[in-house]
Amino acid sequence: MESVSDQAPPAPNFLLRRIVTAIGVSIPMIGVLIALGLFWGVAVRPVDLALLFVFYTLTGVGISVGYHRLFTHRAFETSAPMRGALAILGSFALEGGVIGWACEHRKHHAYSDVEGDPHSPHVSGPGFKGKVKGLWHAHMGWFFSTKGVAESELRFRRDLDADPVVRRVDRLYFLWILLTLGIPFAIGYAVGGTLWLGFEAMVWGGLVRIFLGHHI
């Protein structure tokens, strides 16, 4: 009987990925503009800032310890519940599903700053124009690139597919998108008692926090 790790991975849906990426990048930016308006009107409460700090810290752990050290580099081993928790926290950062993220980062290390590196700033041509293009590509442009994605996932994802915890968390990525915004909203609503205060908490603990994670 053929195991999961021996099966070919599903073909990437590039259109869906680009749509999700565009939403994931643009909505937090809109959230920051809303937050600036709220801050101008002094509509920021301790619970909003607490949610911002706590969720920024937790998702940072999910990306650095989970997505990067554990799933990309296999730097340590841990239990299935901890693998699931780290993968979910990383998903809360809205940087993509755990399998795709780990595959692209493995590819980055395999082709660091040469042709094939998915987000190198040094392969976009010479001169000032090349540097500007490279800066944009390395910061955000590569999110929308489909060059070599299917090949990198075919090469780098077999051990990830072999882990049922990782597969399930990756498959439920849209749920984590809802929860990364829904949990701050629910806490803000529970503390403040109104939908508006729940919305404020979602802006600070969700959208602003995601924006900071993407750009800082």
Residue ranges and their predicted role:
Residues M1-H215:
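Non-catalytic, topology-defining segments of multipass membrane proteins
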